[in-house]
Amino acid sequence: MPQEEEAEYLFKIVIIGDSAVGKSNLLNRFTRNEFTEKTKATIGVDFGTKSIEIDNKTITAQCWDTAGQERFRAVTSGYYRGAVGAMIVYDITSKISFKNVTRWLNELREMAEQDILIMMVGNKSDLEMSREVPTKEAQAFAESNKISFLETSALNSTNVNQSFERLLTDIYHLVSSKKPMVVDDTQNWLVPNQGKKLTPLSDPAPQLTANTTSTHQEKKSGCC
């Protein structure tokens, strides 16, 4: 039997932002092509993986959906380690979630690697009649902070794949232009190793307060 094709690059992406902006549905739409009308707030972390082709290379994205609720900030801080990309999500119908992008951006730049690539996503573009955040305002913010920007709808799939694929493509081009990176043995995180196939290390994930699986954890009330 032919061997299953291995990913040539494995990129860890963290999805952050306030609770109820739609992070879990963005993750599920991209990795599983699923959408749940009434999702509940993620406890701890959820993650999913998906492989795509970029320049004839197999790129696997390991996407982590971290809890956006304030009481989980201490938990999520550990998950920035090893991330080469980040998606900061706000809800276009919630001005406060957009204002809080600044806090998430500052936290990300404080805790993550210096050269992490960032995309800001304005989710729920299907709710145009309830919009509180003008597209031009968000675009200007993204440009002033030198980050990418797209508006998406996890409900109808608008720009979901495009947002992840653009971020992954930017990461790939950055990584492939550099010398090989070294695996951080202290954290056992898989990081890009230019042009070489990656094989999982033993126990690749850190200890979590909630068990990480590729499906949702036990959840509490509220929307994510």
UniProtKB/Swiss-Prot annotation:
Entry keyword set: GTP-binding, Lipoprotein, Membrane, Nucleotide-binding, Prenylation
Residues reported to bind GTP: 17-24, 65-69, 123-126
Listed InterPro entries: P-loop_NTPase, Rab_GTPases_membrane_traffic, Small_GTP-bd, Small_GTPase
Claim: GTP-binding is one of the keywords in the record: yes
Molecular function terms, GO-annotated: GTP binding; GTPase activity
Lipid metabolism recorded as keyword: no
BP GO annotations: intracellular protein transport
A Pfam family of this chain: Ras
Any GO CC annotation of this UniProt entry: membrane
Span list, region Disordered: 194-224
Gene3D superfamilies, per the entry: P-loop containing nucleotide triphosphate hydrolases
Lipidation (S-geranylgeranyl cysteine): C223, C224
Localisation: Membrane
Coiled coil ranges: none
Chain span(s) of sequence motif Effector region: 39-47
Membrane topology listed for this record: Lipid-anchor
Family the entry assigns: Belongs to the small GTPase superfamily. Rab family.
NCBIfam families according to UniProt: small_GTP
Name the UniProt record assigns to this protein: Ras-related protein Rab-11C
Native source species: Dictyostelium discoideum
